[in-house]
Amino acid sequence: MANYQNVTPVQMAQAALTTSYATLYTVPTNPTTPTRTYMKQIDVCNTTGGAVTFNLHIVPLSGSPLTSNALFYTQNVAANTTFSYAGVQVLPTSSTIQAKASTTGLTITISGGEAV
């Protein structure tokens, strides 16, 4: 097993969510220098006057967003508030982070790190 020593902080995504699934981040594939990607912080800001829900998935290579790979599913974000999640998720090589909202008005920011 590789010993990962150097972790580089990265902003993985910042985007306005739409009502269709969008790929926010794709985990890099580097066969000569294996890396491990960590997702550490997710902030979802609701800029509207009403509650909005969102789905966020860690989707395997060649997969689709399904309930079986959901990290958040119909997660409510109250009007004019920010939902924050601070938990470490190790992302498989070539997987993607995909998300959508019930309506427009959510901005998502995802931060993490890449270890070599």
Predicted regions, residues:
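C-terminal interaction-tip segments
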Residues: 1-36, 92, 100-116
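Beta-strand signatures of extracellular beta-sandwich domains
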Residues: 55-59, 109-111
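Short beta-strand elements of extracellular/lumenal beta-sandwich folds
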Residues: 35-45
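Short solvent-exposed strand-capping/beta-turn motif centered on an Asx-Ser/Thr pair
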Residues: 44-49, 102
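Short beta-strand His + acidic residue motifs that chelate non-heme Fe in jelly-roll/DSBH
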Residues: 42, 97-100
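Intrinsically disordered, low-complexity Pro/Gly/Ser/Thr-rich segments with frequent PxxP/GP/PP motifs
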Residues: 60-96
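A generic structural motif
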Residues: 49-51, 94, 105
